[in-house]
Amino acid sequence: MGPLRLLVPANIRHNSGGNVYNARLVEGLRALGAEVEVLPVEGSWPESTAKERRRMGSLIGAWERETGPGEPVAIVDGLVAVGVPDELEFAAKAGQETWVLVHMPVPEESGAGSLEREARALRAATGVICTSSWAADVLKKRHGLRGLRVALPGTDRASLAEGSIPPHIITVAALLPNKDQVLVVEALARIRELEWTAALVGSDQADPDYAGRVRAAVARHGLEDRIRIAGERKGQDLEDEWNRADLSVLVSKAEAFGMVVTEALAHGIPVVVRAGTGAVEALSFAAPEQGKSGTLPGTAVHFEGTDGPEGDSPEGPTLLAAVLRGWLQETITRDAWRAAALETRSRLPGWDQPARLVLEAVSKNWPQDSPGQS
């Protein structure tokens, strides 16, 4: 097998789960002895200009196949891939080996054109690797794809969070409409009579308009002294945020996996997620076996009938507030979630696991099954 060429979107600059996965995957592949070249590709992916698509095509051998003993194997981030279906089809015709790494399927509401581009891109690929079973299931049902590989994210070992008094609730995600921090603020406003503090940790520059909405919601309820908008944190600053936390909340409208879920669990922190998203897989895949304790390290909240396009139906915050109230007031619930999170810590896989799975998938010696149609 020749060197691996990982093509990633250059326009996603905040600390997204996809960026973290890509970086850790590269580290893992290199640790296994693979030669890896990382190429950030300019463009407003998945949208792009003709010039950007032509350059992308040249990087995957769409116009002229790179031959020789060191012929590279391309792995294209899914966000880029869905923007270049023509180029991927040309690369396939040229015999160039090109894989697609899917972090998040195209949202269903994106329209028929976007979904068709996704289907064409994935069918043209040599193979498709998904970073969650949820994403693989969506693509299989949506496009009839087969032979999809799954390489779940790994998790770094982490120190046990000390927690805080009063209990501290944390949401770690860029301030984006999909992450629905406004829902979190509205839920917290409904339990203001209880003792708690909260922090929203994540980039406020990814979508400044939405970040403004989050700040306005905090101010409207007079919660500036209780809800801290921390901005993006990395390294020890992020570790300090985790150390203060007693509960993590991730209620994204769509989530393929939710690496911050397992990151929280690695610190022994239980998590509340939205039912019907891939975050449920993250919450449960390393959880204690049902026969042993039967308790998840947190819960998945059902928002059926409340998830409008803006996520601001009045029932949503009330449902989340009820869950948070129960956790704050019921010692049995709080202790059970914490115990399950502590047990889960030792069961979380490291980053060597997805690296091995990806390397096995793209290896010439690995039996291939083109995505095609099932």
Residue ranges of each PLM-predicted region?
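Aromatic "clamp/platform" in nucleotide-sugar-dependent glycosyltransferases that forms part
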Residues: K253
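Glycosyltransferase donor-sugar binding loop
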Residues: T197-A216, G231-E232
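Membrane-proximal helix-turn-helix segments that form the acceptor-binding/catalytic region
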Residues: V106, S110-C130
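Short alpha-helical donor nucleotide-sugar binding micro-motif in glycosyltransferases
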Residues: E232, D240-A245
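A charged, aromatic-enriched C-terminal amphipathic alpha-helix characteristic of glycosyltransferases
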Residues: E47-K51, E310-L319, Q329-K364
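Short hydrophobic beta-strand element within catalytic cores of glycosyltransferases
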Residues: P270-V273, V280, S284
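Conserved donor-binding/catalytic core segment of Leloir-type glycosyltransferases
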Residues: I129, A161-R190, A199-V201
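Carbohydrate-associated surface elements
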Residues: W134, G154
